Regions:
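Generic "edge-of-domain/loop-turn" microfeature
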Residues: 21, 41, 52, 79-81, ...
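Short, conserved charged micro-motifs
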Residues: 81-88, 147-149
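Short, acidic/charged, Gly/Pro-enriched secondary-structure junctions
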Residues: 87-109
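Mixed-charge, glycine-accented linear interaction segment located at domain edges/termini
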Residues: 114-164
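Oligomerization/assembly interface segments of phage tail-like spikes and tubes
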Residues: 60-82, 130-144
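Hydrophobic side chains in beta-strands
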Residues: 76, 99-101, 111, 140
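Solvent-exposed edge beta-strands and adjacent loop segments
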Residues: 1-73, 115-128
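A general structural signal for short secondary-structure junctions and capping/turn motifs
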Residues: 64, 87-89, 98-99, 126-130
Length: 164
């Protein structure tokens, strides 16, 4: 059955945690949603508009291999020193990333191998309407597509407010 044309794309928020804090992922055989165990600390960034998560599958009959490349393109629209400091740490780390879309779906990226920053920019813009902020690309190669989580993860209470 073809669904109605009411889809709404985009990412609402992105959460990062240190790699190694999740001890297991259990996938429900009926719902196919996953539950994570472990207690990583999650750091949240609210995003809107120009961030995206894309997963591509690469499969080779000749080699007998299949893997999924998870790519997060992240745009943060405010330039400040505290956020820059956190992003510099993320750029050299290999975090887990949870992406929440506008339907409330939470996707766990990088469970087996972590996600790695493959590039980005710190930009002031040239014109009044240009981006003044950060762009980062994170990529992970996994045996599965990102897991749909059965519940949202809770962010740490100490979050950066770039406008404060």
């Amino acid at each position: 059955k073809i669904p109605c044309k009411s889809a709404f794309g985009g990412i609402k928020k992105v959460l990062f945690a240190d790699y190694g804090g999740i001890t297991a992922v259990v996938v429900d055989s009926t719902t196919k949603e996953a539950t994570i165990t472990g207690t990583p600390t999650w750091y949240e960034y609210d995003v809107k508009g120009s961030s995206s998560l894309e997963t591509s599958v690469t499969s080779s009959r000749e080699n007998g291999t299949t893997f999924y490349t998870q790519t997060l393109n992240l745009t943060l629209t405010y330039l400040d020193a505290k956020t820059q400091s956190e992003l510099q740490t993320l750029a050299v780390a290999r975090p887990y990333i949870v992406v929440e879309d506008y339907y409330g779906n939470n996707f766990l990226c990088g469970f087996e191998n972590g996600m790695e920053c493959t590039g980005g920019t710190v930009v002031t813009g040239a014109a009044a309407g240009d981006l003044s902020g950060f762009t980062l690309t994170f990529e992970g190669m996994e045996e599965t597509a990102p897991y749909f989580l059965d519940t949202a993860v809770s962010p740490d209470a100490a979050q950066i407010d770039p406008t404060a």
